[in-house]
Amino acid sequence: MKESQVYLERARSRQQHFLYSLIFREYIYGLAYSHNLNRSLFVENVGYDNKYSLLIVKRLITRMYQQNHLIISANDSNKNSFWGYNNNYYSQIISEGFSIVVEIPFFLQLSSSLEEAEIIKYYKNFRSIHSIFPFLEDKFTYLNYVSDIRIPYPIHLEILVQILRYWVKDAPFFHLLRLFLCNWNSFITTKNKKSISTFSKINPRFFLFLYNFYVCEYESIFVFLRNQSSHLPLKSFRVFFERIFFYAKREHLVKLFAKDFLYTLTLTFFKDPNIHYVRYQGKCILASKNAPFLMDKWKHYFIHLWQCFFDVWSQPRTININPLSEHSFKLLGYFSNVRLNRSVVRSQMLQNTFLIEIVIKKIDIIVPILPLIRSLAKAKFCNVLGQPISKPVWADSSDFDIIDRFLRISRNLSHYYKGSSKKKSLYRIKYILRLSCIKTLACKHKSTVRAFLKRSGSEEFLQEFFTEEEEILSLIFPRDSSTLERLSRNRIWYLDILFSNDLVHDE
């Protein structure tokens, strides 16, 4: 019990920061201004020198403290104005400031953790979204069961504020944060998903931080239980969840938690050293080598944690536990599954001969051709059947710019999908882009494709669509034709990919 309490207090003791005063520091909004794509956000009203000003932020905070302006309905948020600015404008400004300020203590903790673990030099590789695939290739071939879980969202923002108070000790800051959320109370109800979507679009950085913090909170509990399950004797979760009774303000939440979780459905620690957890975008994967009933225990743990701690509903029947060899899952724009390679080995012992069947598991990571064609069709590179079409909106650009745009898209997709087991789908996507580029240039010059290729030279035209991959590999490996040919067929994961391609959608 003491070890559990020490674990809970360790992270909390590092977060003795005072953030309230930073809200009134002009350089904080300068940082937000430099990170914002819309640079006109912090521009003063007509009559000023087009400089961002802290005055408009102070005006908004003053207004939020006025009782008659505390709550503003969503329907009137675009109509009401204050000194020439609407409420959406002020909300975006103050949310950018909140995002910058509240990220500071967590960034300091992350840097400290990386330095303690002596992995700061490798941090960039860990940030790569493709670093997950070598892990899957090394670990998942030894596992038997997998569960693909969608993380439930949205969550009530008041619960997030209460949890955030556990990590950062600054009452005035959270008082101001609550005022900001109350000013937009129509956007923080979980019943109105359209309002949540609107709120996230108006305040993308603030919304992203709240979501990441929510995921970090439930994962910290999960990681603690996972680490302790291998060397602790059987005991209940009650010791760990004592903090909920202290921080939960609503009485019905405490009663619900005590009744439905701690007593009737109390889970216990169990030894499962071969369980692996992977999170990506809004989903997570739980895989294990042991029997499925252990996976079922973790499944119910997640469900009751979300329902009782975060007060967000999750359906048990939406979380399925499947044999890994019979289940494929979507992961960062790839289709992934485990394929069984069966081979027969002849063994001879003295005068007896035996035929032994050997089953080798191999993970297959392939390019999903149909979702990619739908993305290309949505971007007007082809139709829904995958037939290339011209892109007239680019016809006003020069030939060099048109070719450069298509080449950049083709290279990015080739770079992103280089780890695929089968390259046939990738070659088809590159062919669609190549022919779409030719049709766009022919449309610009008011000519047919055949006449344009005849005039330009079909052999030399757009040859970079097929050579850029070999040129990149030749800079890394020896210029041996057999080596490059072998590497072009094998998987190569690039650990410099920090963002997914715009055409990649993990539905």
Curated annotation (Swiss-Prot):
Biological processes, Gene Ontology terms: mRNA processing; RNA splicing; tRNA processing
The entry's keywords: Chloroplast, mRNA processing, Plastid, RNA-binding, tRNA processing
Molecular function GO labels: RNA binding
Subcellular location field: Plastid, Chloroplast
InterPro entries in the record: Domain_X, Maturase_MatK, Maturase_MatK_N
A GO CC term attached to the entry: chloroplast
Record flagged with keyword RNA-binding: yes
Major localisation: plastid
A Pfam family assignment: Intron_maturas2
Superkingdom in the source lineage: Eukaryota
Job description of the protein: Usually encoded in the trnK tRNA gene intron. Probably assists in splicing its own and other chloroplast group II introns.
Family under the similarity heading: Belongs to the intron maturase 2 family. MatK subfamily.
Protein name: Maturase K
Native source organism of the sequence: Lens ervoides (Beaded lentil)
